[in-house]
């Protein structure tokens, strides 16, 4: 269709400049058209070919498909190029973002390593002290229960 429109526009602009009378032939159908104006003869001939000839219709369809496929190839290549550029920019930007964080992470890790030793040591000492008191307290707590358990056992024996 696009091809036929281009030919029609070409016929409307260029052909009126040519001679007044002409004879054009459609070699596919062996018919001749004779008109007084070369421009109208060309347009009539083209319309006749478009309407009657299956070969020309096939050629036009193939031309349209070729144009569409060319546009799709161009479009897909443009999309691929833009995706590559975008991914490249994202990688570069991400590297620029990561670098300061890596440096600051190292700066933060060093005091934390030193500070963790300072923080952990008192907890170790305190936990040892707590364990000692917990063991002593458990013994203190167990003793009355042992006594009461003995008393309860004796009372059950007396009941039987």
Curated annotation (Swiss-Prot):
Q: Where does this one sit in the cell?
A: Secreted; Host cell membrane; Host nucleus
Signal peptide residues are 1-19
Q: Which UniProt keywords apply?
A: Host cell membrane, Host membrane, Host nucleus, Membrane, Secreted, Signal, Virulence
GO CC terms on record? extracellular region; host cell nucleus; host cell plasma membrane; membrane
- Give the location of motif RxLR-dEER in residue numbers: 58-75
- Transmembrane regions listed in the UniProt entry: none
Query: What inducers act on this gene?
Result: Expression is up-regulated in spores.
Function of this protein?
Answer: Secreted effector that suppresses pattern-triggered immunity (PTI) in plant host.
Q: What family is this protein classified in? A: Belongs to the RxLR effector family.
What does its UniProt record remark on the domains?
The RxLR-dEER motif acts to carry the protein into the host cell cytoplasm through binding to cell surface phosphatidylinositol-3-phosphate.
Record protein name field: Secreted RxLR effector protein RXLR-C11
């Amino acid at each position: 269709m696009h091809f036929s429109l281009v030919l029609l526009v070409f016929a409307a602009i260029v052909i009126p400049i040519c001679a007044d009378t002409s004879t054009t032939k459609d070699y596919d159908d062996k018919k001749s058209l004779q008109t007084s104006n070369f421009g109208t003869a060309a347009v009539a001939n083209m319309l006749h070919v478009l309407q009657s000839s299956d070969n020309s219709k096939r050629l036009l369809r193939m031309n349209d498909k070729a144009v569409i496929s060319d546009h799709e190839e161009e479009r897909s290549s443009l999309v691929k190029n833009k995706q590559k550029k975008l991914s490249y920019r994202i990688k570069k930007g991400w590297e620029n973002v990561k670098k300061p964080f890596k440096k600051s992470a190292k700066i933060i890790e060093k005091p934390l390593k030193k500070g963790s030793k300072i923080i952990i040591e008192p907890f170790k000492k305190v936990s040892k002290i707590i364990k000692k008191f917990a063991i002593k307290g458990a013994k203190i707590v167990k003793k009355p229960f042992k006594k009461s358990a003995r008393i309860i056992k004796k009372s059950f024996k007396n009941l039987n």
